[in-house]
Amino acid sequence: MINKENSVGITIYNTLGRKKEPFVPMIPGKVGMYVCGVTVYDYSHIGHARVMVVFDVIARHLRVTGFDLTYVRNFTDIDDKIIKRANERGESIQTLTQRYIDAFHQDMAALGVQPADIEPKATEHLPEMMQMIGTLMDKGVAYASGGDVYYAVERFANYGQLSGKVLDEQEAGARVEVDSNKQNPMDFVLWKGAKPEEPQWDSPWGAGRPGWHIECSAMGTKYLGASFDIHGGGRDLIFPHHENEIAQTEGCTGQHAVNYWIHNGFVNVVNEEGESEKMSKSLGNFHTIRDLLALYPGEVLRFFILNSHYRSPLDFSFSLLEAAKAGLDRIYTALRSAQALLGKLPGTPIGEPADVPAGAPQDLVENYLKAMDDDFNTPQAIAFLFEAAKMLNTAISEQKDPAVIATWARLIRGLGHHLGLAGQDPELWFRSGIGAEQGLQAEAIEALIAERSAARAAKNWAESDRIRDTLAQQGIVLEDGQHGTQWSRK
């Protein structure tokens, strides 16, 4: 059964300690998790997709294993890039940011990413930011200079604890913009003084706007408290963003800010020479989520992301997306065969048990959960999903009792739901492939298949072959089987 009784206890690779550690929440049974969201000045890209899919699965697993999770994921809706883009387009910041917030939600829905419990916007939390900055100034770890307010990193003894960067070494090798207002080149801004043509808010230090780092500290502590369980994001945020968050929050509260820091690896793009390179607009290898969704179902992108361990670098290429689609096709083929026999597939809502049929490996679900408990090892979990699909195919080929077939199908649905995979109707999966909108409509395909079936019944093999070839030219693949002809798009 997929529930907390089968969990052997979660271990998490904690960036703070640089090792796997048993997960022990601060409050038994309850978990608070904050993940840094997107800066909404453009459409989200495949790197954003990885962060959101990874932490969506982590959230699902925490809930399935019995934890009462509060998941917070923010929007940065005030930032230098946002201001620049709004000015370029001659539109308000609110119009720009809301457009990309809406687009983000559409992209996430296509990827099967469930909404976070709380999705705060930075601009709606200015009072909390100002209060935190004021406390830091009162404690002597922040100072005002030239209309700005800065954090004095030398006054926080544990600066560098997350990234492992020693402050003296950073100063010696730092390539930072010269700012005469700073007491130390590594000091970072908490409040930016007002500039012409930029949004601004009144504050005790004059009109201006918040720095980037203070936003997450203020929102995290508001919704999860001065100390909480998990903080996550991409590896690129370890320094300086998350390092600065720790300095701000602990400098303000005097308490340990976060127990477990989780960071996913980078996304690299495989070039024509087969070499991995950093994804960037300048290299012309930049892919937005919606660009990819025009070519592949969102579930393909999700499977592709989860088929690598979240801490490993993720190599991106279209051939790898094709391999991901082929993997999902294998699972849906097994489910389609079961559906043809049973008439209807059993569903498994999250949280409900998924039973292992008699005679099957009784430890399959336990091993699946062990993989997920072991630092959220989704590639290994997917391997067990394939094992279940293999067992379903075997049960069908050996003409097992329909109850056994139904149980295996239910198990696949249950494991898949845990990962956000294999939840679609298998017929719809195969009929809504790439190019479905531009190609033959389903009704036309069904009509041609009916004509072909009549030709086959009349032993008119030439007509049967002609219809098959016509459909093949439209990217439609036919499979003749015991239960009739099934079709899918290439």
Curated annotation (Swiss-Prot):
Record-listed Zn(2+) binding positions: C36, C216, H241, E245
Subcellular locations according to the entry: Cytoplasm
Motif window: 'KMSKS' region: 278-282
Signal peptide: none
InterPro entries tied to this protein: Cys-tRNA-ligase (IPR015803), Cys-tRNA-synt_Ia_DALR (IPR015273), Cys-tRNA/MSH_ligase (IPR024909), CysS_C (IPR056411), Rossmann-like_a/b/a_fold (IPR014729), tRNA-synt_1_cat_dom (IPR032678), tRNAsynth_Ia_anticodon-bd (IPR009080)
Main location, first listed in the record: cytoplasm
Reported cofactor(s): Zn(2+)
GO cellular component, one term: cytosol
SMART domains, per the entry: DALR_2
Motif ('HIGH' region): 38-48
GO molecular function: ATP binding; cysteine-tRNA ligase activity; zinc ion binding
Protein name: Cysteine--tRNA ligase
Taxonomic source organism: Magnetococcus marinus (strain ATCC BAA-1437 / JCM 17883 / MC-1)
Gene label: cysS
